[in-house]
């Protein structure tokens, strides 16, 4: 199982692959779409079970092909969707000015924030997949990021990928 951040540091996509299946969390942009397609090919993903489009006000359509799509823009404000896919359980919460996605893989949880997400209580996860969006709604222990962002403490080494082993081990790159 692999989780990779790809594309632009301003709008990184998340590609989750397990064997030949994948889930993609997409934030838009042609260059990011191309990076996603390259990463899917690199990881040998033949089936994209889900593309979750995290944009609440997209300027262009998401053209990534998938068995299912979950566009945040089509969700009512303050609603959630939960989908079980081969690589992960995907939970998307749409707020007024953004969305939060929590991925559950085995006993590990990962969060992605797009836009501004305000919650009464923070969501607690092991890993935050970072973007320019300040993750005030998320309490996390570890970070995956393409680069350091203004809201971050000065982190010296950042990994953009994580490989999860079947029996609990992991490796960041």
What are these regions (language model features)?
Residues 1-173:
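Non-globular, low-confidence helical/coil segments that flank catalytic cores
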């Amino acid at each position: 199982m692999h989780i990779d951040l790809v594309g632009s540091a301003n709008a990184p996509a998340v590609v989750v692959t397990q064997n030949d299946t994948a889930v993609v969390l997409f934030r838009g942009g042609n260059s990011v779409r191309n990076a996603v397609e390259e990463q899917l090919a690199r990881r040998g993903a033949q089936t994209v079970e889900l593309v979750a489009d995290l944009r609440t006000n997209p300027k262009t359509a998401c053209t990534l092909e998938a068995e299912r799509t979950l566009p945040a823009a089509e969700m009512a404000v303050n609603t959630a969707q939960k989908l079980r896919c081969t690589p992960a359980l995907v939970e998307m919460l749409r707020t007024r000015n953004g969305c939060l996605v929590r991925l559950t893989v085995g006993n590990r949880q990962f969060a992605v924030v797009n836009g501004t997400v305000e919650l009464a209580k923070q969501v607690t996860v092991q890993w935050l997949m970072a973007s320019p969006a300040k993750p005030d709604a998320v309490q996390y222990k570890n970070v995956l990021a393409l680069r350091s962002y203004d809201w971050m403490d000065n982190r010296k080494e950042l990994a953009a990928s994580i490989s999860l082993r079947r029996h609990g081990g992991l490796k960041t790159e």
